[in-house]
Amino acid sequence: MPLPDFHVSEPFTLGIELEMQVVNPPGYDLSQDSSMLIDAVKNEITAGEVKHDITESMLELATDVCRDINQAAGQFSAMQKVVLQAAADHHLEICGGGTHPFQKWQRQEVCDNERYQRTLENFGYLIQQATVFGQHVHVGCASGDDAIYLLHGLSRFVPHFIALSAASPYMQGTDTRFASSRPNIFSAFPDNGPMPWVSNWQQFEALFRCLSYTTMIDSIKDLHWDIRPSPHFGTVEVRVMDTPLTLSHAVNMAGLIQATAHWLLTERPFKHQEKDYLLYKFNRFQACRYGLEGVITDPHTGDRRPLTEDTLRLLEKIAPSAHKMGASSAIEALHRQVVSGLNEAQLMRDFVADGGSLIGLVKKHCEIWAGD
C-alpha cells in the first residue's frame, strides 16, 4: 500500500489511545473476551471508540480528536463508565498497567482481524508475546516536515516519558527488576526502537518505499517504532508509555506530550542531527531499567545527568506551553511525582513487599481503575 499524503491537521490537537487489560475474577488472569465487550458497548459510546487490539485480552479506548486534555478526560470518563458496566454485566474487570504480572503468552488468542492475522503469520509467537499494554498519544501537525522535526524533538525525551509512566515491573510471574519491562517485548522486532534517520518528509517517503520492499510493511501501522508519523491522521504518535493505573495519570502524560510538542515546534530549540541518536538505546534502557533513578548521557558532550534532574528541567521549560495548551495541571501533577521519586512500578513492588500476592495486585489495579 503506498504511503498516503500527509493530512494537514490542526497543530497540537490530541488523540489518545489506552490499551486496557480485560481480566477474569476471582483468579484475575487475562480473559479472552474483548470481542464480547466491544459488542456490548458499541451502541453506547457517543464520543471516542472502544475497539480491538492484538489479542482478545486487550481492549483499546481511543478518543476522538481533542483540543486539550480536559476534552480528552471527558471522553475517557464517559467510555470508562460504559465499559466498566459492560464488564460487570459479564463478570469481568478492567485495569491498567503495562503488563499483566502473571499471564502466560501461550494462552493469548490473536483477534480475528485481517491485519493482526497477517502480523501473526509474519511474526509468529512474538505477536502473542506482545500482549502488553501501552498508552499512545497523537499530536497534530501542520505539515510532514513539521512532523519529522517534532518526531526528532520528542525522541530526546523518550527516557523521560518511559520513566514517568513506568508500570510493568512484573512479567510471567516474575519481578523483572525493570521499572518498565513492556518495551523489551518488542526488542526482537526488526523495526524496534527509533525510526531510521531522515531529515524531512521527502526523505521519509523514500524510507517508507524502501521498507515496503520487504513485503512485511503494508502501512504505517505495521511499524513498531517508539515514535512514528501517522500521515493519514496528520500526527506524530508517541508509543513508549505503559498504560497507567489511573485515567488521571494517562491524561497527565498526554498533557506532558502536548506541551512538549508545543514548545518544540514553537521555539525550535534544537538543530537535529543523526548523532543525536548514538546513545538513544542506552538512555532508553536506563529509563526502562531504573525509572526515574536512571541516568542519561549526552551523545555530544558525554555529560551524564540523573533522569530525575533532567525531567524537572524539562517540566520547567515547557511550563509556558502547558499554560497555553490548558495542561498546567498535568505538569504540576507530574512535578509532584518526580519530587516524590515514585512511579507506579515502585508502588506495585511496595504492595508485594508488604505481603500482597500477584493475584491481589491485579485485583487492586482493577479497584484503582474503577475508582479513579
From Swiss-Prot:
The keyword Lipoprotein does not apply. It is an enzyme of class 6 (ligase). Gene3D superfamilies: 3.30.590.20. Its EC number is 6.3.2.2. It catalyses: L-cysteine + L-glutamate + ATP = gamma-L-glutamyl-L-cysteine + ADP + phosphate + H(+). GO terms for molecular function: ATP binding; glutamate-cysteine ligase activity. One of its GO terms (biological process) is modified amino acid biosynthetic process. It comes from the Bacteria. Keywords: ATP-binding, Ligase, Nucleotide-binding. InterPro entries: GCL_type2/YbdK_subfam (IPR050141), GCS2 (IPR006336), Gln_synth/guanido_kin_cat_dom (IPR014746), YbdK (IPR011793). Belongs to the glutamate--cysteine ligase type 2 family. YbdK subfamily. Homodimer. ATP-dependent carboxylate-amine ligase which exhibits weak glutamate--cysteine ligase activity. This is Putative glutamate--cysteine ligase 2. The lineage of its organism: Bacteria, Pseudomonadati, Pseudomonadota, Gammaproteobacteria, Enterobacterales.
